[in-house]
Amino acid sequence: MHPKILWPNNKKFVFTIFDDTDRANLNDTKLVYQCLDELNFKTTKSVWVVEGKRKQEGHGVTCEDKKYLNWLLELKKKGFEIGYHNTTYNSSFRQETEEGLTKFVKMFNQNPKVMANHSANEENIYWGVHRLSGSRKIIYNILTGFKKNKFYKGHDESSPYFWGDFCKEYITYVRNFVFSDINTLKSCPYMPYQDHAKPYVNYWFASSEGNNVERFNKCISDENQDRLEEEGGACIMY
């Protein structure tokens, strides 16, 4: 268990959200962030920078939508963090990722400080089995039927999907494992942490499971919120 932290302004615990941009549309998302803003929760909104080459049903809006981009810039002015969720919802080659990062900086006047890999994009960095080392990697391969041991190539210098050097340059924090416990810090007490076996990521962080309504509500139940406060913990909902 992480030793109790003295949080700023005498706060008893931390709660924030990393919002995965999958299936987002402007109308619904604006309502959610209006509520968060009224409650003074300055959370993280991830984005896709450009439209993908291959359309995917329900993939969600990207920063190429001018109305959406203008709204994101207003969010940023209010104190919300804009995160990176890969350049787009399709796999991106090295040059495409570099162009996406450059466009992100131009759009938001800053590097994307935080990111999460998107689903099954081949340029995902240290994703799938590559998140693990030693015996844990072997166990993961067995549990997944060796289906994901070679797919992700963002860290592989020989791959056209390699962008590890750009990740090191542009990104400070990359999301790794997700836990069912509301107290993310309790599940991963060393975050943000470094893994010297994975040199292209500066720092890793974990999060708590909330990828659908049922899991989100279960994780942030009143009972769990009370425990988070009692433990003086930190929750990063994903």
Go through each PLM region and give its residues.
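Catalytic alpha-helical scaffold of carbohydrate-active enzymes acting on polysaccharides/glycoconjugates
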Residues: 1-205, 213-238
